[in-house]
């Protein structure tokens, strides 16, 4: 599927530092490659691979089912499914990709649907999740207590459409979708676009709407109301414009935030670099705490931050290739001691030590 060339709703959380799956660098690389095919190859970057995960597959399979449940819950038809909207945040909107390009509207979204009859209009947004994730990340139904990335996605859609409310409908599965697939339940899309759930143990496929209705009867369907938040939207627009003008139009890399960012921006690290005082201090800090931590804790995240900051420094410091660093990055202290190295081993794994 072609990637959007603008800031879409699914990318919004990444630009605000609220995504578990994307970073500003990965979003930037996707946008730049979509706008200018071959951009990554010319710059020596690697385009991030977007994996079609089981969560995505199940989400797509149950989209229509959630629309039916949401429409029945409110007693209002839902229309304009997958309708395109775009804006630059100045109160003018486009409803086709062609018009958005003509007007320079760089914020886009495809809505899941629009409730007929609401004035001002209310948007429909559907989600699927597991029972464990639901109970650890959502608040009481009827409130706006949803994960930050969903809140941001809804605010983005309201920016793009001018709507003032999103009804977020959540279908909860008692198990993770990976567990359902391990049990043999696989969502399959037919040639005419109709989804079904196949299982080789059964003769007939399962219609997602029948499954969804059963879950709803068991209390696994919930709705949340997300209202337009002008202050948050203003901050989002400020960040969007900075990213668009500096990073996209200016073709400047965002600051890397993860080891995956470093791998994409510099897939073939070579050369020797001399650390400055701040990098030396960070590496000493890393050595002092890494033996006492777990990777998931606050100190573990700090160690990861130090690694990323060190490698970003090495990437921009003007490395000199010598006999010892012709196949790796080598970081030396100001007095010539070896502080760290970074290289790709024979299996293709990147090693920092």
Annotated model-derived regions:
Residues 1-353:
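Accessory terminal regions of nucleic-acid processing enzymes
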């Amino acid at each position: 599927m072609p990637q959007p060339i603008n800031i879409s709703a699914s990318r919004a959380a990444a630009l605000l530092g609220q995504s578990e799956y994307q970073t500003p660098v990965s979003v930037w690389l996707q946008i730049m490659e979509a706008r200018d095919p071959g951009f990554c190859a010319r710059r020596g970057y690697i385009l991030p691979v977007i994996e079609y995960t089981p969560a995505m597959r199940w989400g797509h399979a149950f989209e229509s089912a959630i629309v039916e449940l949401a429409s029945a819950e409110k007693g209002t038809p839902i229309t304009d499914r997958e309708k395109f909207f775009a804006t630059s945040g100045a109160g003018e909107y486009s409803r086709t990709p062609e018009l958005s390009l003509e007007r320079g509207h760089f914020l886009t979204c495809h809505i899941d649907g629009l409730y007929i009859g609401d004035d001002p209009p209310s948007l429909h947004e559907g989600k699927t999740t597991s029972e464990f994730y639901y109970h650890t990340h959502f608040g009481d139904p009827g409130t706006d207590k949803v994960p930050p990335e969903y809140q941001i996605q809804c605010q983005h859609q309201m920016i793009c459409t001018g709507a003032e409310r999103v009804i977020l409908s959540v279908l909860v599965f008692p198990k993770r979708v990976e567990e359902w697939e391990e049990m043999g339940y696989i969502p399959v899309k037919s040639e005419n676009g109709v989804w079904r759930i196949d299982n080789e143990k059964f003769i007939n496929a399962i219609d997602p709407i029948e499954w969804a209705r059963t879950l709803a009867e068991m209390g696994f369907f919930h709705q949340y109301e997300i209202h337009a938040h002008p202050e948050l939207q203003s901050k989002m627009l400020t960040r969007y414009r900075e990213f668009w003008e500096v990073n996209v139009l200016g073709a400047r890399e965002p600051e890397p935030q993860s080891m995956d960012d470093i791998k994409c921006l510099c897939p073939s690290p070579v050369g020797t670099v001399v650390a400055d005082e701040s990098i030396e201090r960070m590496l000493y800090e890393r050595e002092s705490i890494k033996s006492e931590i777990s990777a998931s804790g606050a100190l573990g995240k700090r160690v990861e931050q130090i690694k990323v900051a060190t490698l970003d420094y090495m990437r921009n410091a003007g490395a000199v290739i010598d006999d010892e660093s012709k196949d790796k990055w080598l970081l030396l202290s100001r007095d010539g001691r070896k502080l760290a190295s970074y290289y790709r081993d024979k299996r293709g794994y990147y090693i920092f030590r």
